[in-house]
Regions:
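Metallo-beta-lactamase
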Residues: 2-52, 100-118
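Catalytic core of the metallo-beta-lactamase
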Residues: 29-83
Length: 147
């Protein structure tokens, strides 16, 4: 499991705060998990880079995925839930240990990465973007739709 060290430490902290934020020790304290910890941006596999975007959680990470045939995506995940977060550079609603401005800076970071590489920045939970992206990739890349 690839994670930022700050995320694991927060999840294992034993304080009441993580559970108050719906982060449960049981999800982290499992001897079967082979933790691969990072402290900042790091390539975790060829063409896949974890990008530290702390704010939503202390060790939140987004991902840059470069496709073998060219192009790629920057997946914001919970750093930017909706297109509106990206367009307006507005923080997500839930933040742990970060200000709205710090979270907005993470969105700007992802926008810079996407612009520098010419990649599409994909929000984490946008109900319009994800179905459209799935449909586009199904048609253009020959992906098979699930039954």
């Amino acid at each position: 499991m690839h994670a930022q060290r700050a995320e694991l430490e927060y999840g294992l902290s034993g304080s009441a705060e993580p559970e108050a934020n719906d982060i449960f020790r049981i999800d982290f304290d499992d001897p079967r998990i082979d933790w691969r910890l990072a402290e900042g941006d790091t390539e975790i596999a060829p063409g896949v880079t974890a990008v530290l975007t702390a704010g939503h959680t202390p060790g939140h990470q987004s991902f840059v995925v470069s496709r073998a045939g060219g192009g790629g995506f920057v997946f914001a995940f919970d750093a930017a839930d909706l297109s509106e977060n990206i367009e307006r550079e507005v923080s997500v609603g839930t933040r742990i240990g970060a200000s709205a401005e710090q979270c907005a800076e993470q969105i700007r970071k992802l926008k810079r990465i996407a612009a520098q590489r010419g990649y599409r920045l994909v929000p984490g939970h946008d109900p319009v973007v994800w179905p459209a992206l799935t449909a586009e990739l199904t048609v253009t890349r020959g992906l098979v739709k699930p039954p």
